[in-house]
C-alpha cells in the first residue's frame, strides 16, 4: 500500500475494500484512536453487571468506586426518576474528588431501584425480606428505574438522566420463591431478583430497555455521550 502525492491510495482492493473506502476507513480509525486518547472513562461503581454491560459495548474504562453517603439523599416527596438521578450525581461527585487533576477523566455513575405501588424496594436484608419482596411482585407489574450521570472532570459539565422499564412477573408459588432464594442470587439485588440470571425465569415480559433492568441503560448512555459530550462509542 502507498499514498500518492495527493494523499490518495493507489487503486487496489484490500480485505474487500476498494481504495476509496479504504482511505475513509483508515482516516476514521485514526480519528477514533485520537479521539479516544482525549478522555478516560471512569465507572463509579463496583457492580459486576455494570462493568459487563460497558465491556459488551466495547467501552474501555477503569473502576473507581464511589464512597458517597447514599443516605444523604431521601426519596421522600420526589419521583423515583429524580431520586435515582440524585443518587447517581452524588456518586459521580464523590468520585470526581479523587481524580480532580485528571483532565481526561469522564465519570459514569449510576443507581438502580425497583418500585411497586410507589414504594421503593431496595436490597433485601435477609431471606425473609427477600421472600416478602418476591411475594409482593408475584403476578404483578413493577418498575425499574436507573439514573445515570456523566461528569466531565476538567470543567465539571454534568448530565444526569433516568430510564424506566416496566417488568411483569409470573405468578410465583412459595416453592418457587423459596427455591430461588436458596440460590443466593436475591441477596444483593434491588427488588430481590436479577433478571440477567436465574431471576429471569420469574419474569413474564418487560416493556422497555432490558439493560436498564440489569443496571445501566447503555443505549441511552451512548446517546448522551454523543449528543452532550461529542464522544462516540460506535
What do the predicted segments below correspond to?
Residues 119-122, 149, 162-170:
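Short beta-strand and adjoining strand-loop segment in the mid-core
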Residues 38-59, 140, 155-157, 164-234:
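GST superfamily/GST-like fold recognition
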Residues 54, 88, 111, 130, ...:
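Residue-level signal for inorganic ion chemistry
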Amino acid at each position: 500500500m502507498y499514498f500518492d502525492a495527493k494523499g490518495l491510495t493507489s487503486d487496489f482492493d484490500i480485505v474487500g475494500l476498494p481504495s476509496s473506502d479504504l482511505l475513509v476507513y483508515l482516516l476514521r480509525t485514526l480519528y477514533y484512536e485520537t479521539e479516544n486518547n482525549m478522555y478516560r472513562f471512569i465507572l463509579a461503581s463496583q457492580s459486576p453487571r455494570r462493568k459487563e454491560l460497558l465491556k459488551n459495548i466495547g467501552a474501555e474504562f477503569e473502576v473507581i468506586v464511589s464512597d458517597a453517603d447514599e443516605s444523604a439523599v431521601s426519596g421522600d416527596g420526589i419521583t423515583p426518576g429524580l431520586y435515582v438521578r440524585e443518587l447517581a450525581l452524588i456518586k459521580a461527585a464523590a468520585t470526581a474528588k479523587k481524580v480532580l487533576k485528571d483532565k481526561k477523566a469522564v465519570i459514569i455513575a449510576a443507581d438502580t431501584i425497583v418500585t411497586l405501588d410507589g414504594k421503593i424496594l431496595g436490597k433485601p436484608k435477609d431471606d425473609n425480606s427477600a421472600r416478602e419482596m418476591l411475594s409482593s411482585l408475584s403476578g404483578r407489574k413493577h418498575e425499574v428505574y436507573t439514573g445515570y450521570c456523566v461528569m466531565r472532570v476538567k470543567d465539571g459539565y454534568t448530565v444526569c438522566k433516568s430510564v424506566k422499564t416496566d417488568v411483569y412477573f409470573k405468578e410465583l408459588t412459595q416453592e418457587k420463591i423459596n427455591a430461588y432464594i436458596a440460590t443466593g442470587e436475591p441477596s444483593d439485588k434491588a427488588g430481590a431478583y436479577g433478571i440477567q440470571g436465574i431471576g429471569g425465569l420469574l419474569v413474564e415480559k418487560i416493556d422497555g430497555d432490558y439493560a436498564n433492568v440489569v443496571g445501566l441503560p447503555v443505549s441511552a448512555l451512548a446517546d448522551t455521550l454523543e449528543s452532550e459530550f461529542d464522544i462516540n462509542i460506535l
